Amino acid sequence: MKFVFTKFLYVIILLTIHSIGVGGVCFGQSTGKTVFVSSTEGDDGNSGESADTPLFSIKKALTVGDTILLKANDVFYERVELRKGKISSYGKGRKPVISGYKRIAKANWGAIDEHIWRICLTNDNYTGYDTDGSSLLNNVGCLHEYDKDLIHGRKLKHLSDLAEDWDIWQTEHHKKGEATDCDFDTLYLYLNDNPNFLRIEFSVGGIALRMSNAIIENVRIEGFGFGISAGRHSIIRKCEIDAIGGQIQLNNSQYVCYGNGIEFWIRNGLEDCLVEECKISRCYDCACTIQGREPDPPSYIRYRNNVIFDCCQAWEDFFTTDNPDAIFKDCIFENNVIVNSGNTTGFGYTKGRTKCCHVLENNYLGNKGMIFRNNTFVGGNYYCAAKYNGAFKSGVWEGNTCYIKRGEWLIRCINKGDEIIRIPVEKGNFRTLKAATDEAIRRYREMTGDETTRFVIKSDGNINKRIKKLKKQYSKR
């Protein structure tokens, strides 16, 4: 009797630990029905109860169960609202894809001027993501040459601004409340070559996945305005996020384009979240971020063991508040590998854009306590931050390593002028180049409070070899 009771108690303890999570992160385990979904073999009239009777759409599956399994190698052209449960995969092969790409079925670009082409986005000449006629979702972010896996696109404010290959334009109505569905019926492209001979698809606007109190794992997301917008108690694990953003941000009073890979927006008690072992690439803005409103500061958010390539920034954070006491509580960006930030995203940027770096902190009221720990940064400018009381002490830095080229900056100010501290390319007034370099790093440490980042200065060729090697290494994940 004693043995039975002890065994029963042990099981109860295990179940309790499993339900509340590990390390403060709530895993929100689902307890309902498991549903199989396949875009190649499924039908929404099926039961979805087995791999032999899968449903067709994720939307339908979410009305049936709360553990959703997507078939490997399949592509799902839809946006997802995940407010409980879990999305994962089944079968062998590549990760299933949630895609926002809208592919031209038969090339029909028309030339309207020298090097300027036009295409209608509302007809039925497309496969892939269906925007169903006039729609704000036709707010294109990038053009993807899918046979070469190249993305292009610099979205501009006026048609008359088109001047370089892959410049694109859609509407003059870009301020908050101005744009209608019809403003995005047509896309204009500047290109010296004839685009009718290229295999092109467009990324649509909107958010691929909104989630809270849920888990997503082993899924690829591509070709949307945003990748994942996550709330409290979210787990994102072993996912791929690629080709995100470039669209006009329509709720802004100024002309600006957007595009974040994984974003935690601060509201409603944002807490207990985890992003781990993901691969994030080619984001117009940042790969990873925590941002938004106080007075509900975020707590216990972890980004760890991720790989980030070719994004404008690997990390961004800010509070939309004037409260100097608002902080990131136990929020950590750690053990990540970040490669080639701000250099070759595939997107084009308007002249004067300065926020191209590994880490961007838009906090204007001092140190908010965001922790950067044991990360490796390779190729790209290091840190961009707001200056407060004469210093850039916006984060906590512990044990990071940065492989950096001469001429790239250690710190750049985003307010109160354009102050930059670079790794020098010449000795200047110093006796040696090493002395000039030591002084630049000393000034950086004094301004930021970062006493631990190890800066490894390498030649262009060495950095480029490291980037190539890392891309090859992590492409196999």
For each feature predicted by the language model, list its residue ranges:
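Short glycine/acidic-rich loop motifs that flank beta-strands on beta-rich extracellular proteins
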Residues: 79-80, 205-208, 224-230, 245-261, ...
